[in-house]
């Protein structure tokens, strides 16, 4: 498979948004091209094994699902983030780690957990 036929898709979530992410994944998978490979990466800090297993059930022949714990990558930002966590939840900041996690891709697609693909 060539690199152009791989589509990396990133989501960030915590335990509270797993049901919404499930809907998003279901709608994405319903609209995938069978000749493309979709690499789904779920950014999290402490997603339970149960939640991860629920999301793994969306795996298909052309859809792989991986979990990336981002807390290690965000440690350098912790002091700056602490003051802003009152305004946004922590998964909002997981996007800061994307440049560190996506170096082997020219392009990625980042989607919020409540995205519905039509």
Residue ranges of each PLM-predicted region?
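Residues at the C-termini of beta-strands that transition into short coil/loop
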Residues: 13, 44, 69-71
């Amino acid at each position: 498979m060539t690199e152009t036929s791989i589509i990396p898709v990133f989501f960030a979530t915590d335990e509270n948004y797993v049901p919404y992410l499930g809907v998003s994944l279901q709608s994405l998978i319903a609209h995938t091209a069978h000749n493309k490979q979709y690499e789904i990466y779920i950014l999290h800090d402490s997603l339970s094994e149960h939640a991860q297993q629920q999301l793994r059930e969306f795996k298909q022949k052309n859809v792989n699902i991986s979990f990336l714990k981002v807390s290690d990558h965000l440690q350098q930002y912790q002091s700056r983030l602490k003051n802003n966590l009152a305004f946004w939840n922590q998964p909002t900041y997981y996007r800061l780690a994307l440049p560190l996690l996506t170096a082997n891709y020219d392009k990625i697609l980042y989607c919020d957990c409540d995205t519905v693909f039509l």
